[in-house]
Amino acid sequence: MERFEITKTPINTENIIKKVEKREAGAITTFIGTVREWTNGKRTVRLEYEAYEPMAVQMLAQIGAEIEEKWEGASAAITHRIGVLDIGEAAVVIAVSSPHRKAAYEANEYAIERIKQIVPIWKKEIWEDGEQWIGDQLETTAYPNGKPDLSEGEQHD
C-alpha cells in the first residue's frame, strides 16, 4: 500500500486513513482539499490538474519523511488527484497519525503548505468567462500561454 500517490481516479478518503492507522496513534487528522465554486470573485466551472508524476510522488514522499522527522511517531499518507475535477470533488487528501492530536494537526497543516511549495503540480482554473493555468500551488505564478513543457527543459522549483 503506497502512502504517497498521484491518481487520475476519485480519491477514497477511508483508504488514505487506513494507510496511517497504527496502534501507537492517539489521533488521526485528515485534510480534504476540494474544488470550490468561487475563487477571487470568479465562478469556477471545473479545475484541471497536471503533474510531473515521478517527481510529484518523490516530493510527496519527501514531505512524509519531513513530517516523521519533525513530529516523533507521526506517519503521513498523501494522495493528489490529476485530470478534470468538478465542483466539490477532492483534489488532495492528507492523513496524519500521531500519538498526540496537536502533532497530528500541526503535521497535517505542514503537509498542505509543503505540497504548495515543492510538488510539481499545475492547475488550470476554468471559469464561466475564461481559463488560466496556475504555475504553482501557491498561486503566485500564472502561465497565460499554458503550462510549462518539461520536455523543453523548463523546470518547476
Swiss-Prot record:
The keyword Mitochondrion does not apply. GO terms for biological process: Mo-molybdopterin cofactor biosynthetic process. InterPro entries: MoaE_sf (IPR036563), Mopterin_biosynth_MoaE (IPR003448). One of its GO terms (cellular component) is cytosol. It is an enzyme of class 2 (transferase). The keyword Mitochondrion does not apply. Substrate binds at T34, V35, R36, T44, H100, R101, K116, K123, K124, E125. Keywords: Molybdenum cofactor biosynthesis, Transferase. It catalyses: 2 [molybdopterin-synthase sulfur-carrier protein]-C-terminal-Gly-aminoethanethioate + cyclic pyranopterin phosphate + H2O = molybdopterin + 2 [molybdopterin-synthase sulfur-carrier protein]-C-terminal Gly-Gly + 2 H(+). One of its GO terms (molecular function) is molybdopterin synthase activity. It comes from the Bacteria. Pathway: Cofactor biosynthesis; molybdopterin biosynthesis. Its EC number is 2.8.1.12. Converts molybdopterin precursor Z into molybdopterin. This requires the incorporation of two sulfur atoms into precursor Z to generate a dithiolene group. The sulfur is provided by MoaD. Belongs to the MoaE family. Heterotetramer of 2 MoaD subunits and 2 MoaE subunits. Also stable as homodimer. The enzyme changes between these two forms during catalysis. This is Molybdopterin synthase catalytic subunit.
